[in-house]
Amino acid sequence: MNLALAQVGIEPAKRDRNVRRAVGAIESAAAEGADCVALPEIFNAGYFAFDAYERLAEPIGGETHRRIRAAAVEHDVAVLAGTVVEDLAASAAAGESVPATAGLSNTAVLFDSDGDRRLVYRKRHLFGYDSAEAELLVPGERLPTAELGGHTVAVTTCYDLRFPELYRRLVESGTTMVLVPSAWPYPRVEHWRLLPRARAVENLLYVGAVNGSGSFETADLVGRSTVYDPWGTPVAASDEGATVVQANCPPERVTEVREEFPALDDRR
């Protein structure tokens, strides 16, 4: 599977512009042969635009998802619609299974190239340190996976990277690739270099850590989106500017590495 990480530029609370950039990145990635394109955390509004969360919240299948789904179908490519701020009440009214019937969640949706929804993941670990996320949002409860391009794919979001037990649970359910939409800021750039790589090494799987690019009143995003292979080797990486990076991620590589170095079999 050819995985593209779309490190799009994000403007605070400018939904239409941000989604247009995302659609453009999907088109570019598909033209370069991508099978799956991953977008960053809250790419449509900006993670640090906390004052806009309620105003720009959408149900699953709302405006942002409709536009991203249409791009996936048009360009024949699977798309992880990063995350958006989900209006749980509106989703519940539309018949979606939700962790609460009111409030907001930080929600990722994976569409396949036919536009079918394959996975919905709501961020489990909400960030409270110098962030309003933990005050504003409802955490998710489920750890879904989906079959895509020969991989068993899961999604975790940004701060989830600091909780390795989450990834071990995913390995136990057969996961071979984890996509990590993020809004990682300075000054914790060294943590961003370390944590996705550590999760790949520990669990002998692919990690696609996709960050945004842009500046907010309280933080600047570090960019540096990277695909790590099951040895933890960076096989595609960016700097901090808006760009798309792509890597071939053959599922058989996971099998090869786990057979060559069967550390997962030695757990006690």
Indicate where each model-derived feature is located.
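Active-site catalytic loop in hydrolytic enzyme cores
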Residues: 70, 90, 94-173, 187-188, ...
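CN hydrolase (nitrilase-like) catalytic-core segments centered on the catalytic cysteine
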Residues: 63-78, 162-243
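Structural motif
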Residues: 35-36, 151-153, 177
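A short acidic/small-residue loop/turn micro-motif
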Residues: 124-127, 240-244
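Short beta-strand scaffold segments in enzyme catalytic cores
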Residues: 81-83, 106-110, 144-146, 225-227, ...
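Short, acidic, Ser/Thr-enriched surface-loop or helix-capping motifs
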Residues: 14, 111-113, 222, 229-230
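Cys-nucleophile CN-hydrolase/nitrilase-fold catalytic domain and related Cys-dependent amidase chemistry
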Residues: 15, 24-114, 120, 186-189, ...
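Extreme N-terminal starter segment of soluble prokaryotic enzymes
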Residues: 1-5
